[in-house]
From Swiss-Prot:
CDD domains: Bacterial_PFK
Documented EC number(s): 2.7.1.11
Regions crossing the membrane: none
Name of the protein: ATP-dependent 6-phosphofructokinase
Ranges in a coiled coil: none
Single GO biological process annotation from the record: fructose 1,6-bisphosphate metabolic process
Regulation: Allosterically activated by ADP and other diphosphonucleosides, and allosterically inhibited by phosphoenolpyruvate.
Species, as recorded: Haemophilus influenzae (strain PittEE)
Length: 321
């Protein structure tokens, strides 16, 4: 029977992480467990940055963006000797189990601790990219989506005033959920997803045809890493004769107070993680599917479950262009 658990946040921050930490801490305390916070992710674990938390440690954090525990990327965790030391540090504090909040890289760390050192870990999906398998939504995605839509709305105001074409680069790495959803909600004329081969010439020809039909401005939503959006803007302007500007939303998408959906999702997932650990279930990750909380083997989430590309959503977006 576990008596002490720890929680850490790892990788890129996401709105709602604080709500998830709060969900873990208060649920665990309600079950009579002691809770420890690990500061700065796996790097902080390696450096023994561990502090006991109480219910007041998570007061007034549910509405705050980021993560008060801090986060850091720690590639050294790939070293089995580093992982062995981390497991030793956890046990030196009497900690019996660990909740890890982050993306697929964070899950891998939890998987290895569970496999190599029989240390029970549960993963919560915390990333704005919505690219974690085994869940319909990740913590932070809905807030980042609203941030992107707000930016698109503002760009449309100025683009329509100046007959300008605006390119908006949206985060997501190799998952275009944010781009497609923001593109539909923002009424973007063109959506360029990473899951489909990008054809610059085809895009420019589409814009040219729109201008011939009398289109005075346009918004192009494009997933990051596909192309240099500033060079694309110059090429479009040279070809179609309309002023074209590129806006990279960047890390602004990660910040801000989490929306109600993310606060509730994170709170529920945090409590569910504690329930799993109390049942002796380590090596799992939590998700939400069809409005129900679920858990999967963390190895499956990393290796076997493929994210479903929103091809039908993109088809709808194309019809609305």
């Amino acid at each position: 029977m576990i008596k002490k658990i720890a929680v850490l946040t790892s990788g890129g921050d996401a709105p709602g992480m604080n709500a998830a930490i709060r969900g873990v801490v208060r649920s665990a305390l309600a079950e009579g467990l002691e809770v420890f916070g690990i500061y700065d992710g796996y790097q902080g674990l390696y450096n023994n940055k561990i502090k006991q938390l109480n219910r007041y440690s998570v007061s007034d954090v549910i509405n705050r963006g980021g993560t008060f525990l801090g986060s850091a990327r720690f590639p050294e965790f790939k070293d089995p000797n580093i992982r062995a030391k981390c497991a030793e540090i956890l046990r030196s504090h009497g900690i019996d189990a660990l909740v890890v909040i982050g993306g697929d890289g964070s899950y891998m760390g939890a998987k290895l601790l569970t496999e190599e050192h029989s240390f029970p870990c549960v993963g919560l999906p915390g990333t704005i990219d919505n690219d974690v398998a085994g869940t319909d939504y990740t913590i932070g995605y809905q807030t980042a989506l609203q941030t992107a839509v707000d930016a698109i709305d503002r760009l449309r105001d100025t683009s329509s005033s100046h007959q300008r074409i605006s390119i908006v680069e949206i985060m997501g790495r190799h998952c275009s959920d944010l781009t497609i959803s923001a593109g539909i909600a923002g009424g973007c004329e063109y959506i360029v997803a990473s899951e489909i081969e990008f054809n610059r010439e085809e895009l420019i020809q589409q814009i040219e045809r729109s201008i011939i039909r009398g289109k005075r401005h346009a918004i192009i939503a494009i997933t990051e890493l596909l192309t240099d959006v500033h060079s694309l803007a110059k090429e479009i302007e040279a070809r179609v004769g309309h002023e074209t500007r590129a806006t990279v939303l960047g890390h602004i998408q990660r910040g801000g107070s989490p929306c109600a959906f993310d606060r509730i999702l994170a709170s529920r997932m945090g409590a569910y993680a504690v329930d799993l650990l109390l049942q002796g279930k380590g090596g799992y990750c939590v998700g939400i599917q069809n409005e129900q909380l679920v858990h999967h083997d963390i190895i499956d989430a990393i290796n076997n479950m493929q994210r479903v590309f929103k091809a039908d959503w993109l088809k709808v977006a194309k019809r609305l262009e």
